[in-house]
Amino acid sequence: MGNSFGHLFRITTYGESHGGGVGVVIDGCPPLVEISEAEIQAELDRRRPGQSRITTPRNEADRCEIMSGVFDGKTTGTPISILVRNKDQRSKDYSEMKEKYRPSHADFTYDAKYGIRNYEGGGRSSARETIGRVAAGAIAKKILQQVAGVEIIGYVKRIKDCEAVDIDPNQVTLAQVESNIVRCPDAAAAEKMIALIDEIRKQKDSIGGVVECVARNVPVGLGMPVFDKLEADLAKGAMSLPASKGFEIGSGFAGTLLTGQEHNDEFTVDDQGQIRTKTNRSGGIQGGISNGENIVLRVAFKPTATIGKEQQTATRAGEEATLAAKGRHDPCVLPRAVPMVEAMVALVLCDHLLRHQGQCRTLS
């Protein structure tokens, strides 16, 4: 349970960090969507380990294989299965963690819930699980772009106390994001962020930060009232990512400092006769339904739990102990979290697009 996400465009991820591989089954994808392994691979390459000195040195190519659901380069409407085989497992690095719990990791809670856990790489709690999400997100992005011209771009907004301020979510480009290894389009801030990560890596410690993501050209009407509000599903998707600890959309928590008059997005009519808002403090969503403005959201990620510094912990037998974790881990998850956040946004928007068309376009 808990391994599937979505309603009409529904994904189920499978596999473990040190098993034979990881992947995803996508159910509900419309037929005749042109997709290739190369398009999916381009997204996975942004997520894969070992891509720079500030990410985990685990050496995985993460080559994807489409096992079913695509024929002659087009989706068939049947379940799509995508597999990525694990190649660079080093299970011996985790032998000490068989008995000792990593502080702030899922080790203890998995053990307490199930009475058993895969301590090699964390099993299902490993960030390698997100490979399936990113692969599915590549297809969701293709559908969104093809049907509605939606563009989704994520980037690192802040690492520790270093925040990028010279970013316009309405104008930022993928090329700007990918211009440096930290995936921050503010070049000056990016240099400082990289220096921060380099220093913390040398100390065998870790740091966290914030990913901001914008979805542009989102059509009006996506989202459902009450329990299936668009921002609620976006929050669920974002908060299901490993190491995520916070979510906000539009003005977020800063909006609590404003009055209603200051915060309200006043309406206007543009030159094409379309109803627009003068500002976008709502973040593109009002009443749980997209209003046609850009959706802007932020996701906070904690520092990586597995660090090489010695920490106080406990064993499965209930004895106090110390642990200096071995293994290969990200000193900061933010650079690789960018495509993960984009994927979850794409999955939610694609699902709601199909649901909207099914309910509201049936008789039109």
From Swiss-Prot:
<comment type="pathway">
    <text>Metabolic intermediate biosynthesis; chorismate biosynthesis; chorismate from D-erythrose 4-phosphate and phosphoenolpyruvate: step 7/7.</text>
</comment>
<feature type="binding site">
    <location>
        <position position="47"/>
    </location>
    <ligand>
        <name>NADP(+)</name>
    </ligand>
</feature>
<keyword id="KW-0285">Flavoprotein</keyword>
<feature type="binding site">
    <location>
        <begin position="302"/>
        <end position="306"/>
    </location>
    <ligand>
        <name>FMN</name>
    </ligand>
</feature>
<dbReference type="GO" id="GO:0008652">
    <property type="term" value="P:amino acid biosynthetic process"/>
</dbReference>
<keyword id="KW-0288">FMN</keyword>
<feature type="binding site">
    <location>
        <position position="328"/>
    </location>
    <ligand>
        <name>FMN</name>
    </ligand>
</feature>
<comment type="subunit">
    <text>Homotetramer.</text>
</comment>
<dbReference type="InterPro" id="IPR020541">
    <property type="entry name" value="Chorismate_synthase_CS"/>
</dbReference>
<feature type="binding site">
    <location>
        <position position="53"/>
    </location>
    <ligand>
        <name>NADP(+)</name>
    </ligand>
</feature>
<feature type="binding site">
    <location>
        <begin position="124"/>
        <end position="126"/>
    </location>
    <ligand>
        <name>FMN</name>
    </ligand>
</feature>
<keyword id="KW-0028">Amino-acid biosynthesis</keyword>
<protein>
    <recommendedName>
        <fullName>Chorismate synthase</fullName>
        <ecNumber>4.2.3.5</ecNumber>
    </recommendedName>
</protein>
<dbReference type="InterPro" id="IPR000453">
    <property type="entry name" value="Chorismate_synth"/>
</dbReference>
<keyword id="KW-0456">Lyase</keyword>
<dbReference type="GO" id="GO:0005829">
    <property type="term" value="C:cytosol"/>
</dbReference>
<dbReference type="GO" id="GO:0009423">
    <property type="term" value="P:chorismate biosynthetic process"/>
</dbReference>
<keyword id="KW-0274">FAD</keyword>
<dbReference type="GO" id="GO:0010181">
    <property type="term" value="F:FMN binding"/>
</dbReference>
<dbReference type="GO" id="GO:0009073">
    <property type="term" value="P:aromatic amino acid family biosynthetic process"/>
</dbReference>
<dbReference type="GO" id="GO:0004107">
    <property type="term" value="F:chorismate synthase activity"/>
</dbReference>
<keyword id="KW-0521">NADP</keyword>
<dbReference type="InterPro" id="IPR035904">
    <property type="entry name" value="Chorismate_synth_AroC_sf"/>
</dbReference>
<keyword id="KW-0057">Aromatic amino acid biosynthesis</keyword>
<feature type="binding site">
    <location>
        <position position="287"/>
    </location>
    <ligand>
        <name>FMN</name>
    </ligand>
</feature>
<dbReference type="Pfam" id="PF01264">
    <property type="entry name" value="Chorismate_synt"/>
</dbReference>
<comment type="function">
    <text>This reaction introduces a second double bond into the aromatic ring system.</text>
</comment>
<comment type="similarity">
    <text>Belongs to the chorismate synthase family.</text>
</comment>
